[in-house]
Amino acid sequence: MAALSCLLDSVRRDIKKVDRELRQLRCIDEISSRCLCDLYMHPYCCCDLHPYPYCLCYSKRSRSCGLCDLYYPCCLCDYKLYCLRPSLRSLERLRRTTNRILASSCCSSNILGSVNVCGFEPDQVKVRVKDGKVCVSAERENRYDCLGSKKYSYMNICKEFSLPPCVDEKDVTYSYGLGSCVKIESPCYPCTSPCNPCNPCSPCSPCGPCGPCGPCGPCGPCGPCDPCNPCYPCGSRFSCRKMIL
């Protein structure tokens, strides 16, 4: 158990680090491939006009960045993005694996299910319980400027599963936990039949007092000895024989 706790702590720290890196990479991915330092404030820039963290124009420039040729000698608009895309995919795989480990190692017996909502904020997640089913949905709108025009992109997920027969819809609760997982819980562990309450134990009866010992009865008189057989006198070693003539 101690080794498992240490492993989970290290995994949680890795998840926080991964979250920070994913947020940075998504910001890069949502921006246009061209550096718009002259028109707009680029989200990742270090030039004199827009100090850090609003540009990376002093780094190497990608050939597809056209506007940076007019004002700045180099840029990292595309270079950093394409170099880090393999890392982004590996981090996503690590997140999914970690979420499965955390879900399987949870010791709470009242968890009905968990849904991974990575990439969504808690206020963007909705949970609806109706007709014996739980529906977890999340939707996010991405908006960014590109060459004077605004572009929009949408991202949504929807997961649904049925409740066990013994769980009431009013008792279902949910929480947004570690690893961007929404946990659906109920106050009673789901079972096929409702649990019967335990009968109270009956109190122990008091022990009865020990009865007094009865007096010993008088010894009976010894019976009289039987008379000796005349054929076998007492103390004789040989029996008398009757001679027949």
Curated annotation (Swiss-Prot):
GO terms for biological process: cell differentiation; spermatogenesis. It comes from Rattus norvegicus. Pfam families: HSP20. Sequence repeats lie at residues 34-38, 74-78. The C-terminal contains many C-X-P repeats. The gene is Odf1. Component of the outer dense fibers (ODF) of spermatozoa. ODF are filamentous structures located on the outside of the axoneme in the midpiece and principal piece of the mammalian sperm tail and may help to maintain the passive elastic structures and elastic recoil of the sperm tail. Testis. Specifically located to the round spermatid layer and to the luminally-oriented cytoplasm of elongated spermatids. This is Outer dense fiber protein 1. PANTHER family: OUTER DENSE FIBER PROTEIN 1. The modification Phosphoserine is found at residues 5, 10, 64, 87, 108-109, 137, 153, 175, 180. Keywords: Cell projection, Cilium, Cytoplasm, Cytoskeleton, Developmental protein, Differentiation, Flagellum, Phosphoprotein, Repeat, Spermatogenesis. Residues 34-78 are annotated as: 2 X 5 AA repeats of [RC]-C-L-C-D. Gene3D superfamilies: 2.60.40.790. It comes from the Eukaryota.
